[in-house]
Design a protein with these regions (language model features):
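Amphipathic beta-strand/beta-sheet edge segments enriched in Tyr/Trp
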Residues: 96-122
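N-terminal segment of the mature soluble domain
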Residues: 35, 39-87
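C-terminal motif of bacterial Sec signal peptides marking the signal peptidase cleavage site
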Residues: 19-22
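C-terminal/domain-edge helix-coil "capping" segments
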Residues: 24-38, 60-65, 70-71, 121-147
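N-terminal post-signal-peptidase region of extra-cytosolic proteins
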Residues: 86-92, 101-102
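Bacterial N-terminal signal peptides that target proteins for export
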Residues: 1-10
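Solvent-exposed loop/turn segments connecting transmembrane beta-strands
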Residues: 49-57, 95-97, 124-128
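An anionic, turn-rich surface loop/hairpin at beta-sheet edges
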Residues: 86, 94, 115-131
Length: 147
């Protein structure tokens, strides 16, 4: 094979490899304080992030309700609570907007201590819908807790 054809073939292969592999990162973690029994929690309040325009608060509340928890989402948190749920959602643009990362933390309502926390991180090539990411984070938290 002449040198020009070999160089062209290698350049083409390099271009294809560079454009098709990308950074596909998929990471999901959860930690739960060993002294905490998440099964004993009954009433939770999901605190809205000030910049949440994507309805993540509602998704989290719906998923927790489907697990049997009593969940509120209003701006005022009720006085009788077992936990406050906070979250941080990070979004990126890649042709369309997608959620890059979601962190959900279940906190003690009295002192804000994190009882359990989970995180889901998916780059563009492994992106999930917001609902799927909420599911993934909560499933990992409750799996880690043994509930």
């Amino acid at each position: 094979m002449p040198l020009k054809k070999t160089a062209l073939l290698l350049a083409t292969l390099a271009a294809v490899a560079t454009t098709t592999t990308g950074c596909a990162i998929n990471r999901a973690t959860a930690t739960v304080d060993p002294s905490v029994n998440l099964g004993s929690l009954k009433a939770m309040h999901v605190a809205k992030q000030p910049k949440d325009d994507n309805g993540i608060k509602v998704l989290i509340a719906e998923k927790l309700r489907s697990r049997g928890y009593s969940v509120t989402t209003g701006s005022e948190k009720p006085s009788a609570l077992d936990a406050v749920v906070t979250y941080i959602d990070r979004w990126r643009w890649d042709i369309t907007m997608y959620m890059l990362e979601l962190t959900i933390t279940i906190r003690d309502p009295g002192n804000d201590y994190p009882l359990a926390s989970g995180k889901s991180y998916h780059t563009s090539l492994t992106r999930m819908s917001p609902s799927e990411m909420v599911d993934e984070v909560l499933n990992n938290i409750f799996k880690e807790a043994g509930k």
